C-alpha cells in the first residue's frame, strides 16, 4: 500500500524546482579560497572574524596571533595588513577585537581602545595603516561588540562611525573630520 516512491520523488523534484525559483534559491558548492596550514607552516590559525573588504576580497582575523590578513584567492596569497605590537606614529597596535569594512577602509578596533584604519592602495594588497582619532574613545566600555561605518560622501570616502556600547546602553554616532583623519565630534 501507499504511493509509489518514484512518483513521490518526481513530484518532490518538481515542487523543489518551483519553490527554488519562487524564493530565488541557488545551489552552491563551497570552494577553498586559501589554505592557512600551508602558508603558516602548519601553525594553528583561529579565524574569529571575516569581513568583505572594500576591494571585494575577504579579510580575516586570526584570534591566536591577532593578525589581520587580506586573502586574495586569485593568486593564492594572504597578506598580513595588521599585527599587534607594531609601533606606528607614537601608538602601538594592540590585539584586535573587531574588524569591519567601512567605506573604502578596513577598521580594526584593538584591546587598547584604539581604532585603526587600513586603506588599500592598489590591487596587490599594499595599503596604509593609520590610527584614527575618535573623541571619547577611551570611555568606551570593554564590551564593544560592533563598530561600523555608513557613507557620508561616496566621492571622498568619508563615513559616519557607529559604535554599539552595551555597558553604556548606547549606540554612539561620530561625524568624520573633513580631512578624514578621525572623528572629533559625536
Stretches with model-predicted labels:
Residues 51, 57-60, 105-108, 116, ...:
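Conserved beta-propeller blade signature
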Residues 66-68, 114-116, 169-171:
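Structural signal for beta-propeller blades
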Residues 30-41, 77-90, 127-140, 184-186:
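A short beta-strand motif characteristic of beta-propeller blades
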Residues 1-7, 51-53, 59-72:
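Amphipathic, non-membrane alpha-helical rod segments
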Residues 13-43:
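Alpha-helical linker/edge segments of TPR/alpha-solenoid repeat scaffolds
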Residues 75, 119-126, 174-184:
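Short loop/turn segments immediately following beta-strands, especially the blade-tip
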Residues 63, 111-112, 120, 166-167, ...:
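Short loop/turn segments immediately following the C-termini of beta-strands
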Residues 46-54, 95-102, 145-157:
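Structural signature of eukaryotic scaffold interfaces centered on beta-propeller domains
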Amino acid at each position: 500500500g501507499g504511493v509509489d516512491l518514484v512518483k513521490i520523488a518526481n513530484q518532490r523534484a518538481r515542487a523543489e524546482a518551483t519553490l527554488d525559483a519562487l524564493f530565488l534559491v541557488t545551489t552552491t558548492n563551497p570552494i577553498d579560497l586559501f589554505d592557512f596550514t600551508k602558508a603558516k607552516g602548519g601553525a594553528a590559525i583561529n579565524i574569529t572574524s571575516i569581513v568583505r573588504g572594500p576591494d571585494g576580497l575577504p579579510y580575516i582575523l586570526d584570534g591566536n596571533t591577532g593578525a589581520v590578513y587580506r586573502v586574495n584567492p586569485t593568486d593564492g596569497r594572504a597578506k598580513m595588513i595588521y599585527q599587534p605590537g607594531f609601533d606606528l606614529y607614537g601608538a602601538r597596535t594592540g590585539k584586535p577585537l573587531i574588524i569591519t569594512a567601512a567605506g573604502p577602509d578596513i577598521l580594526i578596533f584593538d584591546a587598547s581602545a584604539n581604532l585603526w584604519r587600513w586603506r588599500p592602495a592598489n590591487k596587490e594588497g599594499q595599503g596604509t595603516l593609520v590610527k584614527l582619532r575618535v573623541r571619547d574613545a577611551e570611555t568606551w566600555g570593554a564590551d564593544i561588540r560592533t563598530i561600523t561605518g555608513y557613507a557620508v560622501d561616496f566621492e571622498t570616502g568619508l563615513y559616519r562611525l557607529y559604535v554599539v556600547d552595551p555597558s553604556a546602553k548606547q549606540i554612539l554616532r561620530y561625524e568624520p573630520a573633513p580631512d578624514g583623519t578621525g572623528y572629533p565630534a559625536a
